[in-house]
């Protein structure tokens, strides 16, 4: 099995702590891996898998790879790193699987039966960098914004903190550049974190998502709660006030209407937050940053934390105003495919709203969205594979934009949204909070968001007739 060795080259201690934060019942020895006594397979070459490959190459560890549909970019990178294509039917000691590969995938089950240990990038990072403090963030909605904000607040306190994980960049791309890594953790990643102990963990909320993968809400929540499974009494778990969680860690409940430290001292009024910073994310981030500073023996300076909140900026592609025409605002929230995230977008957008809905339906709960849309949404603009189905289920006035070319469809949908609000002389919000995933028309949610942004800015510039 992978072993955690004791050489100075292997254990790069963070300047923040001499504590070994992760307790694993196995060891990782890079020299053993480099000596080819450890056979490793990287299963899946998405963003995470490529990060794993680059990391292992930097460590001098040879590995093989497998991907059912590798891109030309994937194959070029593997060739550059000197990694050979592996056989998923072969025998390996360790398989580092991409988050998108289900834990019950036939190949992974066969590899496990053959003696392989199946892990993910987070476990790999924790084993090879056991002295690097990791702050883990999960939740149904808000985890990306909270992750970025925690890292920002820690930097405001003078720490070299970087974010990674489910959010760009991959965690393994930042572990050697930071004193602290703040990690966004999806439910997929949290299925593969045996033995992970986080000094500080955050659960932003628990809703319903990814039932196509987890099958039940209970299984989805169980995966999320793995974030605290390895925590001990001196660790901290930040949760929304009222959320009941079984944990050995100290609970730090946050309330979105109050930006305060654990002792109740308020840092600044919620009204003073910059545009686009969600109060709940900010409240959770403050408590998480404070907890880590305390755990590391660093002073907590309220003035610097408050300054960090004031200087925070929203994450691109998360409820971002990308264009304006008069009193019409175009807001890009392409990542809003979870009920909680879409509901938050509908609540925050200035009405009347022209709501762009579409993509591939993944079974989101529409009941809360009907309530959030009442009196706020003027018209739904349906697009993509399941846009019309979603619009009909919402029971709101809608029109459908046909087509199979992503950019062309997005241009037409954005223009239709503007017209629904009365054209350039109207008022309100054209909101892309699509409910459906992007894979029907686009490579990913970022590509969909970028297409919407281009279309909106083209309308502003007069390049597309409104």
Curated annotation (Swiss-Prot):
In UniProt terms, what function does this protein have? Answer: Cell wall formation. Catalyzes the addition of glutamate to the nucleotide precursor UDP-N-acetylmuramoyl-L-alanine (UMA).
Q: Which reaction is catalysed here?
A: UDP-N-acetyl-alpha-D-muramoyl-L-alanine + D-glutamate + ATP = UDP-N-acetyl-alpha-D-muramoyl-L-alanyl-D-glutamate + ADP + phosphate + H(+)
Q: Which InterPro entries match?
A: Mur-like_cat_sf, Mur_ligase_C_dom_sf, Mur_ligase_cen, MurD
Matching Pfam families: Mur_ligase_M (PF08245)
> Quick one: which pathway?
Cell wall biogenesis; peptidoglycan biosynthesis
The UniProt record lists the EC number as 6.3.2.9
GO cellular component term, pick one: cytoplasm
- A single GO molecular function, which one? UDP-N-acetylmuramoylalanine-D-glutamate ligase activity
- Please tell me where ATP binds in this chain: 139-145
Q: What is this protein called?
A: UDP-N-acetylmuramoylalanine--D-glutamate ligase
Q: What class of enzyme is it?
A: ligase
């Amino acid at each position: 099995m992978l072993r955690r060795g004791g050489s100075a080259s292997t254990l790069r201690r963070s300047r923040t702590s001499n504590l070994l934060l992760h307790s694993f019942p196995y060891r990782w020895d890079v020299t053993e891996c480099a000596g080819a006594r450890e056979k490793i397979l990287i299963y899946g070459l998405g963003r995470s898998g490529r990060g794993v490959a680059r990391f292992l190459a930097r460590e001098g560890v040879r590995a093989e790879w497998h991907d059912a549909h590798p891109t030309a970019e994937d194959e070029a990178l593997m060739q550059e790193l000197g990694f050979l294509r592996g056989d998923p039917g072969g025998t390996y000691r360790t398989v580092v699987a991409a988050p998108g590969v289900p834990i019950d995938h036939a190949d992974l089950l066969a590899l496990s039966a053959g003696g392989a240990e199946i892990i993910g990038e987070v476990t790999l990072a924790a084993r090879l960098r056991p002295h690097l403090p990791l702050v883990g963030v999960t939740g149904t909605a808000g985890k990306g914004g909270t992750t970025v904000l925690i890292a920002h607040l820690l930097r405001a306190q003078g720490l070299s903190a970087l974010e990674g994980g489910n959010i760009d960049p991959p965690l393994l791309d930042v572990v050697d550049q930071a004193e602290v890594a703040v990690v966004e953790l999806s439910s997929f990643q949290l299925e593969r974190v045996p033995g992970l102990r986080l000094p500080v963990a955050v659960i932003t909320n628990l809703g319903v998502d990814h039932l196509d993968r987890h099958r039940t809400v209970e299984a989805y929540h169980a995966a999320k709660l793995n974030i605290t499974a390895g925590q001990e009494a001196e660790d901290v778990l930040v949760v929304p006030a009222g959320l009941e969680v079984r944990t050995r860690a100290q609970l730090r409940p946050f309330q979105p209407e109050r930006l305060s430290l654990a002792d109740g001292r308020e840092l600044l009024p919620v009204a003073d937050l910059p545009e686009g910073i969600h109060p709940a994310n900010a409240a959770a981030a403050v408590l998480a940053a404070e907890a880590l500073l305390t755990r590391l023996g660093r002073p907590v300076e309220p003035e610097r934390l408050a300054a960090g909140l004031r200087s925070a900026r929203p994450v691109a592609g998360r409820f971002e105003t990308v264009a304006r025409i008069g009193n019409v605002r175009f807001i890009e929230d392409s990542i809003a495919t979870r009920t909680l995230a879409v509901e938050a977008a509908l609540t925050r957008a200035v009405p009347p709203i022209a709501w762009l809905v579409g993509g591939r339906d993944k079974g989101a709960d529409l009941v809360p969205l009907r309530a959030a849309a009442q009196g706020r949404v003027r018209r739904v603009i349906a697009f993509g594979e399941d846009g019309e189905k979603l619009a009909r289920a919402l029971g709101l006035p809608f029109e459908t934009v046909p087509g199979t070319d992503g950019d062309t469809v997005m241009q037409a949908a954005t223009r239709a949204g503007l017209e629904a609000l009365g054209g350039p002389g109207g008022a309100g919000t054209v909101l892309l909070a699509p409910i459906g995933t992007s894979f029907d028309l686009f490579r990913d949610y970022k590509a969909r968001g970028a297409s919407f942004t281009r279309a909106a800015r083209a309308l502003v510039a007069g390049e597309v007739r409104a």
